[in-house]
Amino acid sequence: MASLYLLLLLPLFLALILAATITESKSFSTTVKAPYPGHKPDKLTHLHFYFHDIVSGDKPTSVQVANGPTTNSSATGFGLVAVVDDKLTVGPEITSEEVGRAQGMYASADQNKLGLLMAFNLVFTKGKFSDSTVAMYGRNPVLSKVREMPIIGGTGAFRFGRGYALAKTLVFNITSGDAVVEYNVYIWH
């Protein structure tokens, strides 16, 4: 009879221990107060500018820093890595007013189609967004008419920023490799 009570009480005892363990363990996530008082990410900002990628001449703004063993024989340049500090301007001409720089890197990361992995900080140097940055990271299928890449963060006015960037190539010089790309960036911050 005692063993019957033991068999009936054992599952109850184990359930109580399990319940106590669950309530004592740390949670994976918690809701916290905003670290910056008054910050409410409810503003949508549209930025429009032109990106000048210069790989030719005496002062290139995009420099190849690495390649793989098959980069030169690959139709997509797979393995190429470049570091950039490209000018961002108000108009499509390189002489138009500079509003910032695109600083970061891109890598040819697709063996079958021309696709770049882009990791950029858009650093703004003029206007109300001066000293603010936007972090853009994603895939750029450069032969598509319009490409979409995610905005994953920012600093300054764009702290806690999120959104997307639309890129459209205006000019690509097949001989020099230089390009002008129009960007429309939408950021919630």
Swiss-Prot record:
Residues modified by glycosylation: N72, N173
GO CC entries: extracellular region
InterPro entries documented for this protein: Allene_oxi_cyc_Dirigent, Dirigent
First and last residue of the signal peptide: 1-19
Glycoprotein among keywords: yes
Source species, domain of life: Eukaryota
Keywords: Glycoprotein, Secreted, Signal
Annotated compartments: Secreted
GO terms classed as biological process: phenylpropanoid biosynthetic process
Keyword Glycoprotein: yes
Function according to Swiss-Prot or TrEMBL: Dirigent proteins impart stereoselectivity on the phenoxy radical-coupling reaction, yielding optically active lignans from two molecules of coniferyl alcohol in the biosynthesis of lignans, flavonolignans, and alkaloids and thus plays a central role in plant secondary metabolism.
Similarity-based family: Belongs to the plant dirigent protein family.
SUBUNIT field: Homodimer.
Protein name: Dirigent protein 21
Gene coding for it: DIR21
